[in-house]
Structures are given as C-alpha cells and as structure tokens.
C-alpha cells in the first residue's frame, strides 16, 4: 500500500479533541458484523470519548453490551457528547441499558473507586468488562527535559489509573462469578508498540506502556483461578486525537508511514481485538498481548 500523509495539524492540549481532527478517525469499519458477543454484559471503558476508546465503546455496544466510559472534564465534553449520542442510537436497537459518560481524573485511587461504584450502582452491581485505555504523552528529546511533575503526571494517567481501576473493578467482578458466561469477566489493558520497540522522544510514555505489559501478565496470574481474564492490546501507529496533540505538524503529516503497511491504522481496525478479548471467544486466553501495528514484528 502506498504511503499515506495527513494534513499538517496540531492541538495544544492533551489528550486531544477528535472533533477537531482532519480527517476524522474511523470508529466502526463498514464491514463490521456484530453477533451479540457481549449481550447482557456491563463494560467500563476509560478514555472512551474518542480515538480507540470511542471505537471500543461503539463495538461493545453493537455486540449488545451496556457501556459506561470516562473522559477528561473541561477538555473532552464535545467528544464525550458525540460518543454518548452514538451509544444511545445503538442502544435503541440492542435493548441494552442506557450508557453513561463520567468525567474523572483517574490518576487517583478514590476517583477510580467512585467511577466503579457509580457504574455498579447504576447497573445493579454488575461489572463484567473493564478496558483501561486512558493515556497521555508528551514528546521530549532528552531525559533531562522531564521533570518530576511531568513523570508523575504521565505515570498517574497511564499506569496508576490502570492499577486503581482494576483494583476496584475486581471487587465487583468477583461478585459475578458464575454469572458472566464461559469466558468469565475480562480486564483489557491498552499498551503500545512502544513498549516493545522503544521511542526515544516518548521516554516516560514508553516506560508506562512497558509497565502495562508487566502489570497485565502479573494480574492475569493472580486472577486466573477466579474466572477473571486479563489481556491487552498493543497498537502501533493509530490515528487518534493523541497524535496532533503530541507532535509537531510535520511529524503528524508523516505519521504511520514508517510501518510495513505504509500507513497509520484507524481505531476501527483496533477495536475488534478488544471485542475478541472481552468475549467468550477468548475464554482460554489470559496474560496475552495482541499486536495491531501495521505489520511490525515484535516478540511478546
């Protein structure tokens, strides 16, 4: 496939706004055929207002799930409203419960507890699926450019939130033992190709993504006997709001051209991997990472 280029563009705030992107990311691939794989399940998706998170929310809803998602208050209301509206349109066809959009700073334990409690309270105590997806990244050429505050911020969003959300969701998932289907409950963590290949200008971000891989493997071992599966997806270059919010215009223009397929992926091409891992189709999988990255060969 020929190399693809995007129009030069830049956004000044993280994690970026999907409604301001050109072109807009694709959330649902046109050929997608839902099959009720997640019917009667309750899912939480962090960072679900845009990008990969939005695509996961919509695919889960198409598969019959009731979906709640989080977003950053004061920055992502418009994207969150778009996602919530799309979820309600789908819900009218599937008969799932009304979706929820929850503003939250997930870098802190108590905030994560409140999100989980709010979702469980709204849906009769049930949580079957947790997708940890919230992330931010900042391009910096040298380790000496990263302050202690910078490091803490990225780690709080990218890995602390995964730990805290999982900690509180697991308490609810344990109550679902025997009622969540053959595949049990599922936690799915979004890592990155950078965890495997490295990225010299995204040092702190890359470190968090490596931590997510290790966290996924360890938690999978801890929860295996409890009927809770823990897996992850490590996307390659995907066209999401994080890209124009992270990089200079020229880098955005060339984004994704370095992979064997010669182009960036769309969120619509990543979301089906989350559906698979959340569904009973993956009932014998835990501790694994799926690599949706345009043909880059990685180990692990």
Swiss-Prot record:
Q: List ligand-binding residues for NAD(+).
A: 44-68
The record's listing under PANTHER family reads: NADPH-DEPENDENT ALDEHYDE REDUCTASE 1, CHLOROPLASTIC (PTHR48107:SF16), NADPH-DEPENDENT ALDEHYDE REDUCTASE-LIKE PROTEIN, CHLOROPLASTIC-RELATED (PTHR48107)
Q: Does S-adenosyl-L-methionine show up as a keyword for this record?
A: no
Gene3D superfamilies tied to this protein = NAD(P)-binding Rossmann-like Domain
EC number annotated for this UniProt entry: 1.1.1.-
Q: Which residues lie in Polar residues bias regions? A: 1-14
The protein depicted here goes by the name: Glucose and ribitol dehydrogenase homolog
The entry lists its GO molecular-function terms as: oxidoreductase activity, acting on CH-OH group of donors
């Amino acid at each position: 496939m020929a190399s693809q280029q995007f129009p030069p563009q830049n956004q000044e705030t993280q994690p970026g706004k999907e409604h301001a992107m050109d072109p807009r990311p694709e959330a649902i691939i046109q050929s997608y055929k839902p099959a009720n794989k997640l019917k009667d399940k309750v899912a939480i998706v962090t960072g679900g207002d845009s990008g990969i998170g939005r695509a996961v929310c919509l695919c889960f809803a198409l598969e019959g799930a009731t979906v709640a998602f989080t977003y950053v208050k004061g920055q992502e209301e418009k994207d969150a409203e778009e996602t919530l509206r799309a979820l309600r349109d789908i819900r009218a066809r599937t008969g799932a419960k009304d979706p929820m959009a929850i503003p939250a700073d997930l870098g802190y334990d108590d905030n994560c507890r409140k999100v989980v409690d709010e979702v469980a309270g709204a849906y009769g105590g049930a949580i079957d699926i947790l997708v940890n997806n919230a992330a931010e990244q900042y391009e910096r050429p040298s380790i000496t450019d990263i302050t202690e505050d910078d490091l803490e911020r990225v780690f709080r969003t990218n890995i602390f939130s995964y730990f805290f959300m999982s900690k509180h969701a697991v308490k609810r998932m344990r109550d679902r033992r025997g009622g969540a289907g053959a595949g049990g409950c599922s936690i799915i963590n979004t890592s990155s190709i950078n965890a495997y290949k490295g990225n010299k200008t995204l040092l702190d971000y890359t470190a968090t993504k490596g931590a997510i891989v290790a966290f996924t493997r360890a938690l999978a071992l801890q929860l295996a006997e409890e009927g809770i599966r823990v897996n992850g997806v490590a996307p390659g270059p995907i066209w999401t709001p994080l890209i124009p919010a992270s990089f200079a215009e020229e880098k955005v223009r060339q984004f994704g051209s370095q992979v064997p397929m010669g182009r960036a992926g769309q969120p619509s091409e990543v979301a089906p991997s989350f559906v698979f891992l959340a569904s009973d189709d993956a009932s014998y999988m835990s501790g694994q990472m799926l690599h949706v990255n345009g043909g880059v060969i990685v180990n692990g």
